[in-house]
Amino acid sequence: MADFWVWLQGALKEPTASIDTDKKHSYNAFALLTIFSATSFLFTVYHAKQGYYGRMASIDAHFMEQFPSLNLFSVFSILVATSLFFFSILMGGFVVKRFVDQDSDWTLEKALQAHSRLLAIPVLLTGIASFFALFNGLRFAVLLCLISIGLTLLANLYIISRPSKDSQIDSFYRLLLAFLVNGGVLFLFFLAEMALVFDYLRILAFM
């Protein structure tokens, strides 16, 4: 744990530095980011349902029947959807590097290391957000999660916008193609994510 904390501090200071580190730190960063994000989402949904929608249910007894119950399947769905979101960011950058830039050296291992350093700030933010979500500080938790998502997408943009040294495509067309390919990957994953959590997002619509 101490080694990971040292790695995280280094990633926060220099997120774009090309440093070969123990791959377990990259896996730990993605695991923590997924767990913190899923926890924030789950507790935000729980408190929103118990608070605002609980009051509405006191007026209309059938109101709560319109929304899904929170159970073990809910936890699993939210965790899988969150994992898919961050994996889509990783895969988007990987596909662009391998098939647009034709960079055979860009492996999933390398993509994981590059992305994990860029996602150090979201790891920290979602960790704080999960704490606030646990204790019903929903608006601050949602704000931190939205900032985290924005930074995650910015990290994805940073990765795909940097051409490989051996890229033979004109820089403008290369960037256009990278956006299209990356967008296609993210969209396919987005459909799967929405299939898993759309009903829970409805609970947050009027929070």
Question: Which role fits each region the language model picked out?
Answer:
Residues 1-37:
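N-terminal juxtamembrane cytosolic/stromal segments of multi-pass membrane proteins
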Residues 15, 52-70:
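Perimembrane loop-to-helix junctions flanking transmembrane segments
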Residues 21-25, 101-109, 163-173:
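Membrane-interface helix-boundary motifs at transmembrane edges
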Residues 36-41, 85-89, 121, 125, ...:
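Alpha-helical transmembrane segments of multipass membrane proteins
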Residues 43-59, 192-202:
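Membrane-helix interface motif
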Residues 46-53, 103-105, 127-137:
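Transmembrane helix-loop junctions in multi-pass membrane proteins
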